[in-house]
Amino acid sequence: HAPIALKAAGVSCVIAKSFARIFYRNSINIGFPILECEEAVNDAKNNHELEVDFTTGIIKNITLGKEYKAQAYPQFMIDIMKNEGLINCVKNGALNSFMR
């Protein structure tokens, strides 16, 4: 339920040092983007502006002018995010190319 609450509260992305497996899976399944990047978490402070590219895994701290590398999302996860969740992704046929 935590990813649902965060998404409903308007949080656009969570970057953390690590996630419990259940939180990670639930987040992806509802189309809530999360990334693991210890260095970005250590440097980020309140009111820092961050920019994330999920296709490359690049996290930019605009405030500090620094870049960090997290693991990029594979295409099927990007499709889940674009469709705002796994259920919508299946309904829209967006995973068909990965199911063959």
From Swiss-Prot:
It comes from the Bacteria. SUPFAM superfamilies: LeuD/IlvD-like. Pathway: Amino-acid biosynthesis; L-leucine biosynthesis; L-leucine from 3-methyl-2-oxobutanoate: step 2/4. One of its GO terms (molecular function) is 3-isopropylmalate dehydratase activity. It catalyses: (2R,3S)-3-isopropylmalate = (2S)-2-isopropylmalate. Catalyzes the isomerization between 2-isopropylmalate and 3-isopropylmalate, via the formation of 2-isopropylmaleate. This is 3-isopropylmalate dehydratase small subunit. It comes from Clostridium pasteurianum. The gene is leuD.
